[in-house]
């Protein structure tokens, strides 16, 4: 060895400090794994964890934020900003829908489809009708909470949430062939003229189980032209080939029910109230709310129909509706009211698909047994499927072992 040269030895083992650090890291990750196992598999742990976390919507009400859409150059100018202060702008297309926790997923998909396909998304104004309180004490259905979820999904959407006092109609509802048809919110469409600002002269009412695959302004403009040329209060696709008599009991017809429709402007035909354009000024002036309520009172005294909110509309309006193209309500995609079997689209062009009937696309997709037509609804679904505690735990295990 040369004079002054310092002797060095190659390390044969990890220095004590590094070894202690490695042991500490392993112990930390082991303890983290135990804590995660406790948090996500123990009810007590999960409750403690989520109590510390920021408040978030329940798992069945979580949605991703929608893409932003903007007006094309051909669109009419609208007031700046969002909110009810500009609801009276004459350039707006007014769309009314109901909101509740079970159908919220459908409502959000419907809104997304409308924004997706219209050339003027900034001119859409939505009017959401929500129950005053949750059904059976379910606070998830409080109007403010539902409105907050809608705002989180569509930050720039112009909308208003209206509280529907269900006691207005609950005493008039009779039993139906399907329990969901007895929900008071199904009758909110009868009260739109009372709920919305008087400056809103016309509104498109849509059920929550629809998606629009065309520009809704085409529906709006066509209905406006048809309503202006007639004394009608409602424009909707009509189906005169349907057996109209089956919507009422044999006792109704035996007792002279046909006289109800005498003197109408045209032959009374079936129309689906899940897609209709309403002239609210004529609705108010003609006292249509009270006309429908009177038939519901008759139904409570003696059964004259079986199908929830539809028959009273038919009794008052069939034969007085301005017909719209069938493309605006490809209905029945949810099957019938009892079995919900799969159905396909009717022949002809499609601008709006409607899963009326028992089967809803989100329920069938989640159950792993979708109908072919349900896959046409799926691209508009913004629902975030909840991850189980096992899924989260597996993620951490894979991450730290990689």
Residue ranges and their predicted role:
Residues 2-402:
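Glycosyltransferase catalytic domains, chiefly GT-A lineage
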């Amino acid at each position: 060895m040369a004079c002054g040269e310092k002797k060095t030895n190659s390390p044969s083992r990890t220095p004590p400090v590094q070894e202690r650090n490695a042991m500490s890291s392993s112990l930390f990750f082991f303890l983290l794994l135990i804590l995660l196992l406790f948090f996500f598999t123990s009810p007590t742990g999960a409750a403690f964890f989520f109590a510390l976390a920021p408040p978030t919507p329940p798992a069945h009400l979580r949605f991703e934020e929608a893409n932003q859409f903007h007006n094309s150059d051909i669109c009419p100018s609208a007031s700046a900003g969002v909110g009810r202060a500009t609801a009276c702008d004459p350039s707006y297309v007014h769309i009314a829908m109901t909101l509740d926790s079970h159908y919220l997923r459908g409502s959000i998909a419907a809104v997304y489809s409308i924004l997706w396909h219209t050339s003027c998304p900034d001119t859409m104004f939505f009017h959401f009708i929500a129950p005053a309180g949750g059904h059976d004490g379910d606070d998830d259905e409080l109007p403010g909470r539902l409105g907050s979820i809608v705002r989180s999904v569509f930050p720039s959407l112009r909308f208003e949430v209206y509280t529907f006092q269900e006691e207005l109609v609950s005493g008039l509802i009779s039993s139906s062939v399907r329990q969901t048809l007895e929900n008071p919110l199904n009758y909110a469409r009868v009260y739109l003229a009372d709920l919305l600002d008087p400056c809103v002269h016309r509104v498109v009412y849509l059920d929550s189980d629809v998606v629009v695959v065309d520009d809704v302004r085409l529906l709006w403009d066509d209905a406006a032209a048809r309503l202006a040329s007639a004394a009608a209060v409602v424009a909707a696709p009509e189906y005169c080939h349907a057996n109209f008599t089956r919507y009422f009991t044999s006792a109704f017809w035996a007792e002279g029910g046909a006289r109800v429709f005498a003197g109408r402007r045209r032959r009374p035909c079936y129309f689906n109230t899940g897609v209709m354009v309403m002239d609210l000024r004529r609705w108010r002036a003609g006292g249509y709310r009270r006309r429908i309520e009177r038939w519901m009172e008759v139904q409570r005294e003696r059964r004259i129909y079986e199908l929830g909110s539809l028959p009273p509309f038919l009794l008052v309006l069939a034969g007085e509706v301005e017909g719209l193209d069938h493309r605006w309500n490809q209905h029945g995609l949810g099957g019938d009211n009892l079995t919900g079997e799969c159905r396909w689209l009717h022949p002809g062009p499609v601008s709006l698909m409607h899963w009326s009937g028992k089967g809803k696309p989100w329920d069938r997709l989640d159950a792993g047994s979708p109908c072919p037509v349900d896959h046409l609804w799926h691209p508009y679904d913004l629902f975030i499927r909840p991850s189980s505690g096992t899924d989260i735990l597996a993620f951490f295990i894979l991450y730290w072992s990689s």
